[in-house]
Amino acid sequence: MFQCSDVFAKLLGVLKVIKARPTTLSLEAAAASVVALMIVLRYLTVKQSKLITDYSKVARKVADDGVEFDEWDFIIVGGGTAGCVLASRLSEDPNLRVLLIEAGGSSQNVAPSKIPVAFAKLMRSPWDYHLYTEPQKHAGNKKKFWPRGKLLGGCDAQYGAPSDFDEWAEIAGDQSWSWNNFSKYIRKFEKYNPDPRFPHVDPLLRGVDGPVEIGYSAHIWPGSKAFIDASINAGIPFSPDFCTTKGTKGTNKAMTYINSKSTRVTTESAYLTDDVLARPNLKVVTHARVSKVLFDTSSGIPRATSVEFASKSRTNKVGPTFRARATKEVIVSGGAIHSPQILMLSGIGPAAQLLRHNIPVVLDAPSVGANLMDHPSVNIRFRDKTGSTFHHFTPHSLNTACLLIRDLLRYNLWGTGPLASNVGESVAFFRSDDQVLFPPAEYNNDLEDANSGPDAPDLEVIMCAGAVHSHNIPLSPKLQAYQMMIVLLRPTSKGSLLLKSADPWEHPLMDPSYLETKHDVDVLVRGVRAALKIAHTAPMTSITDVNASHHPELDNHLSSLSDAELADIVRDRVESVYHPIGTCSMGAGGVVDSELRVKGTQGLRVCDASVFPKLVSGHPAGAVIATAEKLADIIKARYA
């Protein structure tokens, strides 16, 4: 039988030769070893896919006259964070026929989606939509890159403050969304893996038998612990666990969705297991883009009856359109960008905009595409004087290539080493009016309070064991640097999403209106001040090279700048932290009701981050999973 140890022994031998004979073996030899390792490991682990790309198995071509279209009880449009949950939970009832349609493919054999440290490799890749915002008028008039995965699944973990969900309940007029009622769905999906390195976490406060494994990454970068201790010394209290009734305020190591083998967990891997995909009443279609939902308007109230979808070839040729019927409901789960786009392409949206693109108006719904919000962020970078950052992940020398091979071996064989890191290993959540961090004698504390409650933070600093210009654009190869990402959790700026055309293959116009309000600039400047304070507080002083000469890619000089000068830097550098929400929001003036039914229609719901009426003071993926769990229960009770 073939053994992984054989692979290790042979590749380790290659590594030793490379180190011993650097003058005769090049970086290409090192790269070849890496490729060999990945090919062998992929061969050993690949599974036969149960996903469908032959659409005739689940639907019929629209062009075929006189055919009966395939029928399903529920059609779920979009296999992202929410869609996979819904498909799994609804198909638990063998009497319900469920069809899930995803524009991308499976993430299970895409290495960057499974290796924790490699998520940035998905950006600007074939698995990314390559989206850009409209020019941001208050942020240098730049178009901002918005990475959006084109794969089944997706996840991250820090849920927000309890008062965030109480605020949702008030907006929705439904107390089932309050923390006391909604948090049970967080516990339902969680499977916490206790870690002896972190005894402060109370397992009784976490879910233990859900499908989504959650815990701490196997690798801890030395700067991670230094950041936590420096944050405490700067005045931010230690938090035993961000994901309890105490909320997110404080500093600690970040939990993430990761299993015991150090593989990233997504809702595809957690919910669409082999056993689930084997259910005869569930089919999952991939590489198919839904162009519109169709309605029966004969009763006067539009009722969703079917969806149309197609695919593109590698030569960009659009294939035939297929149609499938939904006898009960269509659930749109395309995310904050694609869900409103699909609704508008289907005739549900602002009438004037639909008519501009010659789309027949099924329902004038002005709120579709409105209320677009995102967590804006700013990176600051410092030289790491310990030489322990992850700069070798982009090899620039024989030595860094050897280090990368070493780390690939450690990760693929034992699930350890830097590749098991989630990069942003430690975090600090705090308020911009914290009088310990920002003493009244030094700071003007009359900032607008945009938080959901007194214990909810509005700023987050993420400590990263490496540095980039933005997203996945690397710094100079030989520069050993780390970065702090300052995230504005409760912006007051709101934008919108509009159609560019009636073509479903054309990206919509996305304008988050970053930094439109003075509040957002002022709070981010204060966040930069806090990050600088942490970077220059012991024991971070053992990591930060505070005496480094000025470098155009480093930010040691920021401490000497005025607030006005920092505001200019904030406007220049602001980027997305990948959390858009709100474009199909709940609420009195929103798109959906508290059971996520599209108002003014029948048989149509939306379930993803687009229904969130406000941003949480954490990361939204956990709330999306819980929302899908909640909706699955609502639907199963409705059709029991």
Where are these regions (language model features)?
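N-terminal redox-cofactor-binding region of secreted/periplasmic oxidoreductases
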Residues: 2-640
